[in-house]
Amino acid sequence: MGDQERQSDPLKLLVRELLLAVGMIGLLILGLYAHTGSMPPLVVVESSSMIHDSNGEVGSIDAGDLVLVHNRDYDSVVTFAEATDENNPHFGYAQHGLEGDVIIYKKNGEDGTPIIHRAIMEVVPNQISTPDRNVPMNATDAERCPNGGTYDSEWKDGNGTKGVCVLTWDVPGTSVQDSETVSVSFDGDQAGYYDCKRPAHANVESHLVVWEWQPRHAGLLTLGDNNKCSVDQGSQAVNGSSGVHSASGTVGPIRSSWLIGVGGGEIPWLGTVKPVSYTHLTLPTTPYV
């Protein structure tokens, strides 16, 4: 009799199955949120900019992978420079097949497809001065900082007031300290060795070189593991870099307010299914990167 009732009322059966599916998805989302502290708790990787092996491998990020997004403080992000510095407490720290953390961020803090790339180094203000706070909102750096320096609208002065003129920079994990411009050779001497996986030719080295960079503001320099040293911040930071672009232009150093999260565990092998199919496979609101 029970089988006959189920067969005679397919609508009830459909509703029951849908409620069960929604409940299971809800429990999964809550469990992932409890683990990561982030919502949505994972992202779907579309780009091949982080792959280490064209055939895919466990332990690095491939197109099609699902990657957990951990809600971590900006100050806890470990850069490649720090993780390859023997004198740094984070020496040897590695994630997804290489030293340093992989972060997910909004391009220039704007809406759009986020980026998942590795944090290579951080530029931190050393000497700062107080800007002219009476200039209009659209004032240039020269107008805001008549005594020199680069205006950083988010860095705070000693009184906790946002907006300073940065005169010199530090780069933790490297020999760069109190420098007006940032030059770092990741050659294993001045900083940890970063292999560009490209042959040296003309003025292009086989390792990563940041040369006389004048950062727009404090933040992280980022790079896809498979991008052959073409950093997100463009040619002003590294010669020959095409950069990552948003509606407002080339991405600047990644600010804390742009950080979505830090890449955690991956769910591999889903890359064998084309990302276009993920609308049927992923959790609701799962973004693509």
Per-segment meaning from a language model:
Residues 125-179, 183, 208-211, 215-233:
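Catalytic Cys-His active-site segments of thiol-dependent hydrolases/isopeptidases
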Residues 279-285:
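Conserved small/polar residues in nucleotide/adenosyl-binding loops
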Residues 1-11:
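N-terminal Lys/Arg-rich, disordered targeting/topogenic segments
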Residues 212-275:
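Extended, hydrophilic extramembrane loops/domains of integral membrane proteins
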Residues 127-136, 266-276:
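Short acidic, Gly/Pro-enriched loop/turn segments at secondary-structure junctions
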Residues 13-24, 29-155, 160, 165:
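Feature for secretory/organellar precursors and membrane-associated catalytic proteins
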Residues 92-95, 185-219:
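Intrinsically disordered, low-complexity acidic Ser/Thr-rich regulatory segments
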